Amino acid sequence: MRAVILAGGMGTRLRPYTTVIPKPLVPIGDRPVLEHIIRSQIKAGVEQIDLCVSHLGELILVYLASADIPPSIRLNFHWEDEPLGTAGALATIPDLEGTFIVMNGDVLTTIDYGELIAFHHQQEAALTVAMHGHRVNIDLGVIETDDGFVRNYIEKPALRYQVSMGIYVYDERALRHLPDGPCQFPELVLRLLAAGERVAAYQCDADWYDIGTVGEYERASADVERFPEKYGMEPSLPSPPELYPVDTQRDIDDNGLHPARHAAAATARGGRSSS
């Protein structure tokens, strides 16, 4: 099984944390959110992981070079010189085939990937979107009108929606509908629907946090601290990891990875890195 992790975002909503580290390396418990994602995918049977990186991507390469990842797992890095969007970034990966997972690099979840993929195959879909219930509180009174007259008044209602979890299963045929250049995921969905392709919706009730804002980051951290076993950690948590200066000139060959400067010399931007 293969997975793609989108890890190139600027993380502007999570500042000041992301001024010095990329959002996927923000610590949740005793490890970065990116390592939570990778470990859960490996547990689900993923054998090859492609990371699309950009903002502070060198730090991601250096971190994963020393992370506790089985050497049998193949990691590939793909650089975006300019933003290509949440769907367009897939165009930097030259050999995507069959069925594969795509997910944002800032998602903490206990989703069952095996169940998600089985659902995707059952639906015979070109694309499956994992969804989660989300409540939006309106802090004002909502007025419903008709022809200039008030018909209803609802004080501070709570609205419920099904929202994307930032986790998807692609069939390779979905990639045929990518345009040249940047493309956001919603645009790809509309292109698929216009072409008559099947886009499935997987309802998920697992724990899920989109680590895109300071508030969500703090809620995710609190959940991991209270229930570490859900996320594959020991009940007694050490302090979150600290960032130390690293020597990006150092060769690291144990996992077939190289620090940023060596990778930059050996890898064409926008293409596939050595692995």
Name each model-derived stretch:
Residues 46, 97, 124-125, 196-197:
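Short, high-confidence coil segments that cap the C-terminus of an alpha-helix
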Residues 10, 21, 56, 107, ...:
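A generic "binding-loop/recognition-motif" signal
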Residues 25, 142-145, 201:
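A structural signal for short hydrophobic beta-strand segments in well-ordered beta-sheet cores
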Residues 14, 60-64, 220:
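Hydrophobic packing residues within well-ordered alpha-helices of enzyme cores
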Residues 123-132:
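A short, conserved acidic/glycine-rich loop-to-beta-strand motif
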Residues 1-19, 264:
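N-terminal nucleotide-binding beta1-loop-alpha1 segment
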Residues 2-5, 27, 31-104, 110, ...:
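Conserved N-terminal catalytic core of the sugar/cofactor nucleotidyltransferase
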Residues 101, 108, 114-121, 134-137, ...:
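Catalytic-core segments of class I nucleotidyltransferases/pyrophosphorylases
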